[in-house]
Amino acid sequence: MAVMLNSTVGVKLASTDISDHVSSATLSQIFDELEITSLGDTSHKFTKGLEASTLTLDFFNDFAASQITTLLQTNYGTTITAVLIPVKGTAVSATNPLYTVSILINNLTPISGDVASINSSSISFTCNSTVAYATTGTF
């Protein structure tokens, strides 16, 4: 089993590389569970429904032009493309796959923290598409 330090994840939103502002990224691939339990069954049975994935990003707010907070504010209420790769700077492959998904920018936290902390945000975005998994391509 290969074990890796998770410090090289690459994250792009709307083709802008925001990796240098992200402190944590979590892509949760989830499907709705549809119950199909019938009379006579001895346990619940489920089948896959629609995909309902989420992307959670923890990042440092930055209001400069073309930076993350401005990018999100500009796209607030719209759907943009998010691209993630486990090891940025390394070719896309079976051991370094590319994940692409459309996310709805439906919530923002542009101001957060207290007098002694960094202005940062932790936001979960609703995915508006299935998560595409690729072993070829470019980040």
Predicted regions and their residues:
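Short, acidic/charged, Gly/Pro-enriched secondary-structure junctions
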Residues: 66-106
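Extended hydrophobic/Leu-rich segments
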Residues: 13, 68, 85-87, 125, ...
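Single-stranded nucleic acid-binding surfaces, predominantly the OB-fold ssDNA-binding core
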Residues: 33-37, 86, 127
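Intrinsically disordered/low-complexity terminal segments and short unstructured peptides
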Residues: 7, 15, 25, 77-80, ...
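Solvent-exposed edge beta-strands and adjacent loop segments
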Residues: 1-63, 99-122
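Acidic glycine-/aspartate-rich tracts in secreted/extracellular proteins
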Residues: 60-65, 129-132
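C-terminal or internal capping secondary-structure element at the end of a domain, subdomain, or sheet
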Residues: 114-138
